[in-house]
């Protein structure tokens, strides 16, 4: 695999997001554009110039934390270091920009995402109760 992490390719990130099977409904390009501002970081992982993963975040809370809003890796490229490479770049960038932590939100049913985050040093900070326990949202944070 010839993995390359590039910054700023929002269309590539949205293209990958639409192919992530865990995302039951995906955001259109205009939703990304309306949420993101100058604080945003858009990363796309490419293999042979084809997008295979992405990570998008921004300064949502204005409290020193960077919000890792959306991200994913195509199933055929999982367990190959793509998610770690994206997270490494995001964390280094956030530190350089002066952020003191990274926050993310996932769902209880995404066990692989929860395990990945815990392995990278994230703590569970707050559950958001839901009638369907599998749909419960879970906030996580990593101090940088």
Please tell me what each predicted stretch does.
Residues 94-106:
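Conserved GNAT acetyl-CoA-binding A-motif
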Residues 1-27, 138:
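Short amphipathic alpha-helix that is part of the acyltransferase structural core
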Residues 40-44, 54, 70, 103, ...:
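Short hydrophobic/aromatic beta-strand element in the GNAT-like acyltransferase core
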